[in-house]
Design a protein with these regions (language model features):
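Extracytoplasmic beta-rich ectodomain segments of secreted or membrane-anchored proteins
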Residues: 70, 74-170
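Beta-strand elements of well-folded, non-transmembrane domains
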Residues: 56, 127-129, 162-164, 225, ...
């Protein structure tokens, strides 16, 4: 029964996530806030993930779109020879793909002209393992996207770990510490022996709100013990977790 409840809650969060959209967020504040919550529970930093989906002018030219995508990559100090580029530009499809896979970061950027009325840029930055001094990079990316879009969806998640198994009651202590740090109210929680998932509304996160069970949420916290490696992972996301855990 617990597994069924967990599955239903995760599916519900994924459905809700498809509906979120906002134009004026502050990635510096969001990253700093998520990082401070990880620090307050003394978890070891593992990586940071962020996903963007920006609706742009549908009549953007191929060359201009290509230039925007390469400018995004430059923000993170990626050299030309580290970029894998591909495109599918014809009468049926108009798509540009850029992929970067380095030791400390993975970047996937797509520029898509879906039809005569819709065009998008999607940016997926995963496993960003650099911990300090990355706020400026995300601020610059945010500003660049705002030059071309007034409608951007953003999902951010910071991941930490403990290199051991924790007592089950410690999960609640960790959750309480994060909620306190975020000035957050718990809205819903599911817990079993090796897993905890909670959604909440944090006063310090003044954006990216979703409606969940009739209440506003902007914070998703999960704790999972991975028995195969003997480590406990903590996921702190706003507004919801969009990665596998």
């Amino acid at each position: 029964m617990n597994k069924v409840k967990i599955f239903i809650s995760i599916i519900l969060l994924m459905i809700l996530g498809a509906a979120i959209s906002y134009a004026d967020s502050n990635m510096n504040t969001k990253y700093s806030t998520l990082k401070s919550s990880l620090e307050c529970i003394n978890a070891e930093y593992e990586f940071y993930n962020v996903k963007y989906n920006s609706e742009i002018e549908y009549n953007i030219s191929k060359e201009k779109l290509k230039k925007v995508l390469f400018n995004i990559v430059k923000i993170f100090g990626v050299s030309q020879n580290e970029i894998v580029y591909d495109e599918n530009w014809n009468n049926k499809k108009k798509e540009i793909f850029i992929n970067v896979e380095l030791e400390n970061i993975k970047i996937s950027i797509n520029g898509i002209k879906k039809n005569s009325n819709e065009a998008y840029i999607t940016v997926d930055i995963s496993e960003h393992k650099v911990y300090k001094h990355i706020e400026d990079d995300y601020n610059e990316l945010e500003k660049l996207l705002k030059n071309y879009s007034s409608n951007t969806e953003i999902y951010a998640c910071i991941v930490g770990k403990y290199t051991k198994k924790l007592q089950n009651d410690k999960y609640d202590d960790i959750l309480d510490e994060i909620l306190y740090n975020m000035s957050a109210e718990e809205i819903h929680k599911i817990k079993n022996e090796h897993f905890l998932s909670a959604v909440a509304y944090g006063k310090v996160l003044r954006y990216s709100e979703l409606n969940y069970l009739g209440k506003k949420i902007n914070l998703n916290i999960a704790i999972r013990y991975k028995e195969d490696i003997g480590e406990t992972y903590v996921y702190i996301a706003s507004p919801i977790i969009k990665i596998d855990y």
